[in-house]
Amino acid sequence: ATDYTLDEFMGFAEKYKRIIIKPDNMYAGIGIYVLELSGKSFHVISSGARDDTDVSAENTASYHMLKDGYESTKAVYDFCKMNNYCIEEYIEGHRVYSKVSPSSLNTIRVTTYLSDDKKPSIIFAANQFGYKGCIVDNNDDSCIWGLIDLETGAVTDVDIDTATGNIYEKHPDSGQDIVGFKNYNFEAVKKLALEAALVIPECRLIGWDIAVRSDGTAEIIEGNVTPELDLYQAISHKGLRTVLI
């Protein structure tokens, strides 16, 4: 939500110290910032924005304001309100994910479909691993997708890096296996996605980005009403017809 007051914003920041702020209507990690509270100012730890092309013209000045370092809590609050930014707790991912890519949370995209009789099902699931030191894991330029076997929770296929043509069966930064990677507590991840699919029945097709926290619990980061069904085809090198029918 973006309807928080300055006192609520400050209370949240003081509780968690390190927070995430992100626009409520963007994609691919654009405009995300990791901020750390230091006294009465925030230090910008890292950003999901790659350059000025990732922010709208009217927000360019605000982008540079945050990008350049320390800002007062009031200035950051004003920036968030002006640009409809959400504020979130900074989440530490489980060690099995950070071992593969320590810079990002490495969420799991679980795409669900709600049938006419209101029965949820999972169409497909895929790991999102960041690389190149990026904090976001769903950016086309800095993400490796791995298709997950829904029964075993293991990665079976990876997508092609469109910039280089490489297929990374091992993570290019850490050298850890991507193909064969076993997701932690995957049954809980699936259960959470199926439960979430019932919350907004008007949206029958949603791609849930779910994190496995450091304590092993699953938590939804966001839901995407444009879940990128082409991801399945790009990763599996197969069509979706047999999956959807």
Question: Model-predicted segments: where are they?
Answer:
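Active-site nucleotide/adenylate-binding loops and adjacent lid/helix of ATP-dependent enzymes
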Residues: 1-108, 113-116
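Protein kinase-like catalytic core scaffold
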Residues: 19, 121-123, 219
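Anionic group-transfer/hydrolysis microenvironments
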Residues: 24, 90-91, 111, 126-128, ...
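Glycine-rich phosphate/pyrophosphate-binding beta-alpha loops
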Residues: 29, 128-134, 224-233
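Short acidic-glycine loop/turn motifs at beta-strand connectors
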Residues: 36-41, 114-119, 150-152, 213-216
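ATP-dependent carboxylate/phosphate-activation module, predominantly the ATP-grasp catalytic core
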Residues: 48-80, 99-191
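C-terminal active-site "lid" helix and adjoining low-complexity regulatory extension at the edge
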Residues: 166-191, 198-203, 212-245
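Flexible, glycine/charged-enriched surface loops at secondary-structure junctions
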Residues: 207
